[in-house]
């Protein structure tokens, strides 16, 4: 809208390595897409130091494109609860990865952790009280589409979901826990 010919942003990630966490770029309806890129934190810091010294010219060389949309699917496994089968506990990770990653940490580790947890729960002699649903969500990186599709498909059962948890970046130290639970539910979380 203001006439920019390109856009560069500081990485959305928090790691200090040279791989920027690029996220996704969207443009409002009717706006012409422009080249956009994320800089790693060290590179963004260097650019900020240079900008502080005076005007800076940046050349952008991107090798990317749009190949259209594709259909993907959530993968869902379920262990039926023994005494409260209508109450559901969801654990999961997501199947896709961002463009600079191998997918090992984000999020094959999360899928592996939750699949292993589901397997261990399924091996127990005493089955869980509630139904355990293990989900490998599709298309998280482009806008949480797998999670949104699951929510839409189960909208009439939302009150039966006791808790939903996703393991993302599951192979390192746990550095945060986030919840959208209402304040009244936070003591249970």
Question: Could you say what each language-model-derived stretch is?
Answer:
Residues 104-111, 182-186:
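Short, conserved loop/turn and helix-capping segments at secondary-structure boundaries
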Residues 1-16:
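A conserved hydrophobic secondary-structure block that centers on an alpha-helix together
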Residues 10, 92-94, 135-137, 167:
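Generic beta-strand/beta-sheet core signal
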Residues 5, 114, 131-133:
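A fold-wide structural signal in alpha/beta-hydrolase
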Residues 108-116, 145, 149:
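Short amphipathic alpha-helical face segments that pack within enzyme cores
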Residues 24-104, 116-119, 123-131, 152:
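Soluble metallo-hydrolase cores and metallopeptidase-like ectodomains found primarily
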Residues 16-24:
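Glycine-rich, charge-decorated loop segments at or immediately adjacent to ligand/cofactor-binding or catalytic sites
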Residues 34-46, 51, 84-86, 99, ...:
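Metal-dependent peptidase/peptidase-like ectodomains
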